[in-house]
Design a protein with these regions (language model features):
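Extended amphipathic alpha-helical regions
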Residues: 1-112
Length: 112
C-alpha cells in the first residue's frame, strides 16, 4: 500500500478536506482505501497535505491512473512552487524518496 500526497495552501485545507471527505463517503474516489489530512496545527510549512491511500504499488500504470483521477476529480491546482505529486510507499528504498511522480503543467503565476 502507498499514498498520493497532494499539497494545498493551508488557507484552503478545511474547504478541500470537507469536499474530499464527501467524495470518499459517496465512493467517488475509486480504489482509494482511506484518506488522511494534515492538521491545522501551526508548523513551518506554508502548505498542508491530503493523503490518498491505494493498493497495488507495484503496478505503475494503475497507480498513475489513480493519481490522474485525483487531479481530475479534485480539479487540483497546486500551491505555488509545487510542480508534481508523489506516490510514496514503504517499499521505497533508502536511495529514493518516492516511488512514482506525476508532473503537473503549472504556471506559478496562476497557482494558489
Amino acid at each position: 500500500m502507498g499514498r498520493w500526497a497532494l499539497p494545498y495552501p493551508r488557507r484552503h485545507i478545511n474547504e478541500v478536506w470537507k469536499s474530499v471527505r464527501t467524495m470518499y463517503k459517496h465512493d467517488e474516489l475509486p480504489n482509494c482505501k482511506y484518506i488522511m489530512c494534515s492538521t491545522g496545527k501551526d508548523n513551518k510549512e506554508k502548505n498542508s497535505v491530503i493523503l490518498f491511500y491505494f493498493d497495488s504499488s507495484k503496478q505503475e500504470d494503475k497507480i498513475k491512473e489513480y493519481g490522474n483521477m485525483l487531479i481530475d476529480k479534485l480539479k487540483y491546482k497546486p500551491p505555488s512552487g509545487v510542480h508534481g505529486i508523489y506516490y510514496k510507499s514503504k517499499t521505497v528504498g533508502a536511495d529514493k524518496k518516492y516511488l512514482y511522480k506525476i508532473d503537473l503543467n503549472v504556471d506559478d503565476s496562476e497557482s494558489d
